[in-house]
Amino acid sequence: MSLPHATIPTNLRRRAFRRSCDRCHAQKLKCTGSNANLVRAQCQRCQQAGLRCVYSERLPKRNLHKEAAAGTTRATETSQPMTATSSTVFSSLAETPPPYCSPPTHIGTSALKETLSEPSAATLQFYDTSINFDDPESFPGGWPQPNTFRDDANSNESSGIPDLGYDFEGPLDATAPVSPSLFDLEVEGNSSSGQSNTSNTQRDLFESLSDVSQDLEVILHGVTVEWPKQKILSYPIGDFLNAFGRLLLHLQERVITSSNSSMLDGCLQTKNLFMAVHCYMLSVKIMTSLSQLLLSEVMKAQPCGQKQSTRMDWYWSGSTTRNDNGRAEALPSFHSNLHIGELISHLDPFMHALSSACTTLRVSLRLLSEIETALGIAQEHGAAASIRLVLSDMPSTSWQILGAENKTITPASRLLSVLWSDEAGDEEPKSTKASGKTINVLRRCYKEIFALAKKHNIA
């Protein structure tokens, strides 16, 4: 007779035990017992302590994804009755107003006094017993009104709070006062905030002028050292003109100074005047060196050979020159990569150099004239005015730099008269270098270049 086979369920969970005993697991120590699946011997620590090793069953691993999904489902199911409950509560609140929605009770009513507990003896020393909360007349200044959100001017003065003058109930006035020109004086209030703003503006202006001064110094070094080593017509002129434009922009900035300004404001204004005049002198020296290079380039481009003269005659006359045999002379050759803008320089280098020099000097002269106007230099005292007198064939004696003792000239002109005293005295320059008679050299270069332009009908 055979026994029936035992049915083994298929869903039995496999029991797993820890690899370390309970004592080693609790102390976070490495267990030295046996790692056999069925028989686990005692570890050395348990043997030395005379204890029995116990290996507990390992807890099953948790499935976090399933638990999170189950938690979301429970939260969804729970929120539905809560939503219904909350809607019921809010509807009941809308029907029956709460007690705190009723009109507020006066602070001096007997109900409030009954609510307050009787103060202790230690607290009574901080109370003013002369104030009766039932009598508004006993409160100093009367009861404060419930809709009072701002004090009047009298209360501000009495409390020591300055009235800033801002009225948020009316429209804001965004118009700013018109400022005078640079280095002028305007009467303003003597408030400390106004003086501080003026000082900060003067410092910002000095930093801007210092940056322009550094750029002009770099350009002056390039004109006197780097540019003579190469063709002047191929050198970029944009940096020079942009520096002139920035100087003009900073000189046109408005700085308000007060008649009661501090000594510091006066010192800052004088420092800005010196820096502005320094930038102006750098500009004049750059124009002097540049005009010398342009005049030298024009002189080099003058026709001196038969080949160049024939090419210029062919371009300007419109007829072809023929030799004794009646054959036409060789036409000028053109490079395959010749650009349209380079065609005039290829056919007539002299006219190209002369027209380029005239254009550069005209633009520089106009910027220099506007800088003199913004700086406050009178036309009869500036270098630009002297150049115009030369170009108009007027006697040079009509232009002169007045002495410092003349009180009618501006501060910038008075300062220039001192700084130019050793560079603009004689009519003829003692040296052709930029360090010599700067203005006289500048006037001579302008006169010679525009005389050639007038001769060739391009002035």
From Swiss-Prot:
CC per GO annotation: nucleus
GO terms of molecular function: DNA binding; DNA-binding transcription factor activity, RNA polymerase II-specific; zinc ion binding
Keyword terms of this UniProt record: DNA-binding, Metal-binding, Nucleus, Transcription, Transcription regulation, Zinc
DNA-binding region, residue intervals: 21-53
Gene behind the chain: mlcR
Protein name: Transcription factor mlcR
Residue numbers spanned by region Disordered: 64-84, 135-170
Database matches in SUPFAM superfamilies: Zn2/Cys6 DNA-binding domain
Pfam family, one: Zn_clus
Family matches, as CDD domains: GAL4
PROSITE patterns: ZN2_CY6_FUNGAL_1, ZN2_CY6_FUNGAL_2
Organism lineage: Eukaryota, Fungi, Dikarya, Ascomycota, Pezizomycotina
Use of this protein: Compactin (also known as mevastatin or ML-236B) and the intermediary metabolites Ml-236C and ML-236A are inhibitors of HMG-CoA reductase involved in cholesterogenesis. Their hypocholesterolemic activity might be useful for lowering cholesterol levels in the blood and reduce artherosclerosis and coronary heart disease.
Organism: Penicillium citrinum
Protein origin, superkingdom: Eukaryota
Residue stretches of biased makeup (Low complexity): 69-78
InterPro entries for the chain: Carb_Metab_Trans_Reg, Zn2-C6_fun-type_DNA-bd_sf, Zn2Cys6_DnaBD
Cellular location(s): Nucleus
Signal peptide: none
